[in-house]
């Protein structure tokens, strides 16, 4: 199946998209995609071209994506929070010749800094779904490429260095929507898309999957608590795919009445603290199903089945996924022990754009090496212990920050927590705990240390504790540990770190 075939999965007169006060039936949706395809073809877009999308969530983002895909071109969604220099890097790296935007971007200086002489034609995304008179329809291309043809380039956030573009095929994406079938979405359900569409989690789970089953996608351009809660209530939203920070805010600000139509809540993007999960379930009577995925896997790899979720687990692998847990020699570890989680399936990326060495490293042996440390229980439910790169080695002992963070979250008054490895002359590395507090809360570090000492081995206790007004996050809700560490090291160099 090709990605743009999803636009015809629903009944023609059923509502496919809701974007604030605008509603589009599946028939109107298909017509808008056709209009966009014709506009793009008239502008010069051809098979294999890379077309950037720089936009907040909107119906037009969806029209643009499917219009690009239907021409055999590659969509390149770009994080709208990036600086001009970061945007220019992606344009240069992907070889983007067309950029769909709400407002024209002035990238002249940024492109010059990167010595990029590409001529980029900027197209107004706001009118992309409208029929344009005086242009010829784009030719039918259905038989000229198959589902192994590349569809999209998803750029990683760059938290570990220069962003890499994961290339996903039509098959990668449509196969992943099939893999999600056990989430039970039906045509009568209404799925909220509030996570950014440029991110694979928001796109596949909140757009492609509901379209695959002929359901309704309810679009919000960004998350604000008041509007999100009102939309859930007024539109009768049934399915939520969100990140832990949104789960936490809904618990604090929404009422049970606001959330009465919600049947399914899936958390992804980053690890879900147990306290957030239990507080949410106690208030709304709906269990959060935690899942796991990566941009490189389209993204879903595991998911807790509704009604069978295990707290703290990322669930079993979805159908069609093969997985292993391996040691440093790539040998399987004994059942129940920890090791790197590696996976294989039809949803795994084709590779990184123009990065053959990075592709070989990530897909060595035919398996996607996730960089995550995991274990499995006797029922086949998987648990992410931590990131390999985040693991702290102190006096030869492995410390997994997530284990410490889970306990810090349980201490009264703590709103956010991140444990990060810092240099220690004696031990090699030690943990530093950065945290923020709930409004009006105060805590005693001495009491926090006592609490941790009662529950952890002494070598796991962070050496330092630093309170911040809030912890910086990436666009997908992950705590930006690299940014925290960078700021800490800069302040320390200036003698200002507290």
Set out the residue ranges of the language-model regions.
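AMP-binding/adenylate-forming catalytic core of the ANL superfamily
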Residues: 82, 99, 240, 345, ...
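Gly/Ser/Thr-rich phosphate-binding loop
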Residues: 237-242, 251-310, 322
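Conserved ATP/PPi-binding loop(s) of AMP-dependent carboxylate-activating enzymes
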Residues: 316-320, 331-362, 397-399
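Conserved pre-ATP/AMP-binding loop-to-beta segment of ANL
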Residues: 136-155, 162, 184-190
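Conserved AMP-binding/adenylate-forming core of the ANL superfamily
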Residues: 15-45, 49-58, 62-66, 83-88, ...
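Conserved AMP-binding/adenylation subdomain of ANL enzymes
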Residues: 174-190, 200-239, 252-254
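Structural core segment of the AMP-binding/adenylate-forming
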Residues: 42-43, 70-132, 439-441
């Amino acid at each position: 199946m090709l990605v743009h075939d999803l636009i015809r999965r629903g009944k023609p007169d059923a509502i496919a998209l809701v974007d604030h006060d605008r509603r589009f039936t599946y028939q109107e949706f298909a017509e808008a995609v056709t209009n966009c395809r014709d506009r793009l073809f008239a502008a010069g877009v051809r098979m294999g071209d890379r077309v950037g999308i720089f936009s907040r969530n909107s119906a037009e983002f969806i029209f643009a994506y499917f219009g690009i895909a239907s021409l055999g071109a590659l969509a390149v969604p770009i994080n709208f929070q990036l600086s001009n220099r970061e945007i220019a890097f992606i344009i240069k790296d992907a070889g983007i010749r067309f950029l769909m935007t709400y407002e024209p971007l002035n990238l002249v200086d940024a492109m010059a800094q990167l010595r990029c002489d590409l001529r980029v034609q900027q197209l107004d995304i706001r009118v992309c779904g409208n029929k344009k008179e005086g242009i010829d329809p784009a030719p039918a291309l259905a038989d000229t490429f198959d589902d192994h043809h590349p569809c999209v380039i998803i750029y990683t956030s760059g938290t570990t260095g220069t962003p890499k573009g994961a290339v996903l095929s039509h098959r990668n994406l449509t196969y992943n929507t099939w893999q999600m079938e056990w989430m039970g979405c039906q045509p009568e359900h209404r799925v909220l898309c509030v996570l950014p569409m440029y991110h694979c989690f928001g796109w596949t789970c909140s757009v492609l999957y509901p379209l695959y089953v002929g359901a309704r996608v309810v679009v919000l351009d960004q998350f604000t608590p008041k509007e999100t809660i009102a939309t859930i209530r007024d539109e009768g939203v049934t399915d939520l795919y969100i990140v832990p920070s949104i789960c936490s805010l809904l618990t604090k600000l929404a009422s049970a009445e606001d959330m009465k139509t919600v049947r399914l809540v899936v958390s992804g993007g980053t690890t879900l603290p147990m306290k957030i999960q239990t507080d949410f379930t106690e208030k709304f009577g709906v269990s959060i199903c935690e899942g796991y995925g990566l941009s490189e896997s389209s993204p879903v790899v595991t998911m807790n089945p509704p009604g069978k979720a295990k707290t703290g687990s990322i669930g079993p692998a979805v159908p069609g996924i093969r997985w292993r847990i391996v040691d440093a020699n790539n040998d399987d570890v004994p059942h129940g022990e920890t090791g790197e989680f590696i996976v294989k399936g039809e949803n795994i990326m084709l590779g990184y754009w123009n990065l053959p060495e990075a592709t070989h490293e990530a897909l060595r042996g035919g398996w996607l090496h996730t960089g995550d440390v995991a274990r499995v229980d006797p029922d086949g439910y998987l648990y992410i212990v931590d990131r390999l790169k985040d693991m702290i080695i102190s006096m030869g002992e492995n410390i997994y920050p997530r284990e410490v963070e889970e306990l810090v979250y349980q201490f009264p008054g703590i709103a956010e927590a991140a444990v990060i490895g810092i240099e220690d002359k004696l031990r090699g590395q030690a943990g530093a705990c950065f945290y923020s507090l709930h409004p009006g809360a105060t805590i005693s570090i001495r009491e926090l240390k006592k609490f941790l000492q009662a529950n952890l081995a002494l070598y796991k206790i962070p050496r330092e504790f630093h309170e911040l007004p809030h912890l910086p996050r990436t666009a997908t809700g992950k705590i930006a540990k690299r940014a925290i560490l960078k700021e800490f090291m800069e302040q320390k160099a200036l003698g200002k770190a507290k």
